[in-house]
């Protein structure tokens, strides 16, 4: 069996170029399902293809496990970065994401269906896609690196953050303990040089308003993953009880705690273990879909 290949893709959706990275099972094997991964702030789809460490790549591991994996450059990143007016509104971003997935997949088989993975700021788009009318057709959703309440230390640091300024202490929130990550990752290999303007508003409205407003509308299984060394969000039992209660419309809400991981759970030394747990959940959702 040859190692999976990751290919860049570019499609046009409503006049906006949308870029992505794609990995597929070796032909002629049809995919078990399609996993669409959405990165967080300050990075790109490269987040899901850890540079220099193919064993830590969600894209490569997913294809090897029998899934088609599409890692989107979130609207406002990658090829869509020069089109701020086309990504300013949440509904625009949802339509662009769904449109990009449809164009990338085309007539190719989708197996049991499409499953969404969101990390950090990417959870906002994934949640909006899940709460959309089209979300009822999804297999399920994986959320990681997000929450309902900021950790007290993070709250003070993030207050000073802006598109132009990275406040002191931000690196420690996102990348510590440093020994959790390969050295190459810590040099900024996955960092995006730009960020869309709409993210400034998201940082102030997501936890307080958007998350609790969207969660009840999600009607598919949800898994919520917490890194052992998460420093941005409150992850204690009380916080998780509150979050679970928000997902009143989902048939299943599961919490997964990933040992040995920091906030950037798909780039650390334990990323392969984390990704394997995601694939297991996707398989469970696919089996439930097939069983009717």
Where do the protein language model's features map onto the residues?
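Short beta-strand/loop motif that positions the catalytic acidic residue
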Residues: 218, 224-226
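Short, surface-exposed "cap/lid" segments of acyl-processing enzymes
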Residues: 29-64
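Conserved loop-alpha-helix segment in the C-terminal half of the alpha/beta-hydrolase fold
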Residues: 228-261
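Catalytic active-site module of serine/aspartate enzymes centered on a nucleophile-bearing elbow/loop
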Residues: 252-292
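N-terminal cap/lid segment of alpha/beta-hydrolase-fold proteins
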Residues: 1-28
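Glycine-rich "HGGG/HGxG" loop immediately N-terminal to the catalytic nucleophile
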Residues: 46, 73-88, 264
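Conserved alpha/beta-hydrolase
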Residues: 55-81
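Conserved acidic catalytic loop of the alpha/beta-hydrolase fold
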Residues: 94-112
């Amino acid at each position: 069996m040859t190692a999976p290949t990751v290919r860049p893709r570019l499609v046009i959706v409503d006049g906006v170029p949308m870029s992505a990275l794609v990995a597929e099972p070796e032909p002629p094997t049809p995919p078990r399902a399609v996993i669409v991964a959405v990165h967080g702030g300050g990075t790109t789809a490269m987040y899901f293809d850890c540079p220099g460490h193919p064993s830590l790549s969600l894209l490569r591991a997913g294809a090897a496990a029998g899934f088609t994996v599409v890692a989107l450059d979130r609207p406002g990143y990658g090829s869509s970065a020069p089109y701020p007016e086309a990504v300013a509104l949440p509904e625009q971003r949802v339509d662009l994401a769904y449109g990009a997935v449809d164009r990338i997949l085309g007539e190719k088989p989708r197996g049991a269906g499409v499953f969404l993975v969101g990390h950090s700021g990417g959870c906002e788009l994934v949640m909006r896609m899940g709460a959309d009318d089209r979300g009822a057709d999804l297999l399920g959703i994986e959320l990681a690196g997000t929450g309902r309440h900021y950790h007290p230390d993070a709250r003070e640091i993030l207050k000073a953050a802006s598109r132009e300024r990275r406040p002191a202490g931000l690196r420690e929130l996102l990348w510590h303990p440093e020994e959790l990550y390969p050295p190459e990752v810590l040099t900024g290999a996955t960092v995006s040089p730009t960020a869309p303007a709409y993210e400034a508003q998201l940082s102030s409205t997501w936890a307080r308003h958007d998350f609790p407003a969207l969660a009840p509308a999600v009607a598919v299984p949800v898994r919520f993953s917490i890194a052992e060394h998460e420093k941005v969000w409150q992850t204690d039992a009380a916080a998780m009880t509150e979050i679970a209660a928000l997902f009143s419309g989902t048939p299943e809400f599961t919490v997964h705690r990933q040992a040995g991981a920091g906030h950037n759970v798909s780039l650390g030394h334990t990323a392969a273990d984390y990704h394997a747990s995601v694939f297991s959940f996707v398989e469970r959702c696919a089996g439930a879909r097939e069983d009717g």
